[in-house]
Amino acid sequence: QEGIFQTIYPPALESLAKKYRPNSADITGASVEELEKELMKGNPSIVWVTAYCRNPEMGYWYEGTPDQLWVAKNLHVTTLTGFDEDYYYLTDPGIGKLKIKKSQFKYVYDTIGKKAVVVR
């Protein structure tokens, strides 16, 4: 075990998002096509991927949990704000704006577990 694993999961973030945008929802399990449909309606999604959408470094986490968790050591939560034919666009307060190939985003998003909260 190296370092500290910290994150927020979709149910907790959904509760917070609803305080500001009442129609926000935990859409964990949504496909990338469903995320695109939300974007076409003007709704960004907060997504669980990795920093810069690099390949996930998966491993087990034990401390502080009753069971072992299978998580990405390089997990990162960011906002999906747009797409075109070839790319997804992410906006991250710590990293800035990113343009990620659709195939790479889908691979990372799917591997992490398709976790997302749509902001409506």
Spans of model-derived segments:
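Cysteine-nucleophile protease catalytic domains, especially the papain-like/related folds used
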Residues: Q1-P44, V117-R120
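Structural motif
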Residues: P44, I46-W48, V77-T78
